[in-house]
Amino acid sequence: MSIGKLLSNGALLVDVLIIGAGPAGLSTATGLARQLHTAVVFDSGVYRNAKTQHMHNVLGWDHRNPAELRAAGRADLTTRYSTIQFQNSTIEAIRQVETNQLFEARDNEGHSWYGRKVVLATGVRDIPLDIEGYSECWANGIYHCLFCDGYEERGQETVGVLALGPIANPARALHLARMALRLSESVTIYTNGNEQLAKEIQQAAEESPVGASGLKFEARPIRRFEKGDVAKTVIVHLGESESKTEGFLVYNPQTEVNGPFAKQLALNMTEGGDILTTPPFYETSVPGVFAVGDCATPLKAVTPAVSMGSLAAGGLVAQLQAQALPEFRLDQEL
């Protein structure tokens, strides 16, 4: 089975260009392969969970390295199916060729690739806190998701929640704190110098049906984080000289969609900075462009990414099989 149509300029035309080879992109490719549709999956080698040794809450893959899942998915696609090609390169630009309703993607080596549809599975970049030591502790003591991490450190005496950035409001801070309380005897909520926010969170906790039992509130500025010597502990240095050791910290950071493609294609975005899509097939505001995985949902985890990719494949298949292949003309440049 051919992996695409070779054009007169030497470029490859496939049904779908998939930008990203994480769980979402691989899942999309699998669905397309099952209907003998052609696709190129572009793998930049950049993954949000690259620092993570184990993934969790993934059926059948619990406590396995996420690299194993990616490798297995890629192996399935290359050994069992013949219509999917992988390209280890970074796409730098995408545009729609208006004259023929195709899409052109250009990689970091100057090669052009053409597809009838595009799937953005680029993932996101976590925006770090501007506090010394944060990056060293990220994913190794500071966790963004307590379904993904934390269970292995259960039974702590104390853990911390950082009510900063997107978590700097009572509802989100208390949600994470209550999840953390399942794994620890007490939870300290840090507001990094914001005394008013600390009061608001405390008041909301005390007035809630479950109360504030087990919760502590720390409004002093955080000077720096330091990785502890034991397990996933993090030392939080406060004010001038005091410090507190936590079993681990919880913080869900602001994220930024990887790549320039949302801007290049003029896609609509959500208030949270994700690509806006329409379920159940996750097509964006530009017809023919789909977005799946972390770049298109606030629920940034492996299982939702796989689900989104599978559903997007269903939408892609329906469109591809209902639309005639447009005539191809090379009359525009990026």
UniProtKB/Swiss-Prot annotation:
Any idea of its EC number? 1.8.1.-
Q: What class of enzyme is it?
A: oxidoreductase
User: What InterPro entries does the record tag this protein with?
Assistant: FAD/NAD-bd_sf, FAD/NAD-binding_dom, Ferredoxin-NADP_redctase_2
Top-level lineage group:
Eukaryota
Nucleotide-binding listed as a keyword: no
Q: Needs which cofactor?
A: FAD
Q: What keywords sit in the KW lines?
A: Disulfide bond, FAD, Flavoprotein, NADP, Oxidoreductase, Redox-active center, Virulence
GO terms for biological process? cell redox homeostasis; cellular response to mycotoxin; gliotoxin biosynthetic process; mycotoxin biosynthetic process
| Molecular function in Gene Ontology | flavin adenine dinucleotide binding; thioredoxin-disulfide reductase (NADPH) activity
Q: How is the cofactor bound?
A: Binds 1 FAD per subunit.
Q: Which cysteines link up through disulfide bonds?
A: 145-148
Report the function annotation for this chain: Thioredoxin reductase; part of the gene cluster that mediates the biosynthesis of gliotoxin, a member of the epipolythiodioxopiperazine (ETP) class of toxins characterized by a disulfide bridged cyclic dipeptide. The first step in gliotoxin biosynthesis is the condensation of serine and phenylalanine to form the cyclo-L-phenylalanyl-L-serine diketopiperazine (DKP) by the NRPS gliP. GliP is also able to produce the DKP cyclo-L-tryptophanyl-L-serine, suggesting that the substrate specificity of the first adenylation (A) domain in gliP is sufficiently relaxed to accommodate both L-Phe and L-Trp.
State the family named in the UniProt similarity comment for this chain. Answer: Belongs to the class-II pyridine nucleotide-disulfide oxidoreductase family.
Q: What is this protein called?
A: Thioredoxin reductase gliT
Q: Which organism is it from?
A: Aspergillus fumigatus (strain ATCC MYA-4609 / CBS 101355 / FGSC A1100 / Af293) (Neosartorya fumigata)
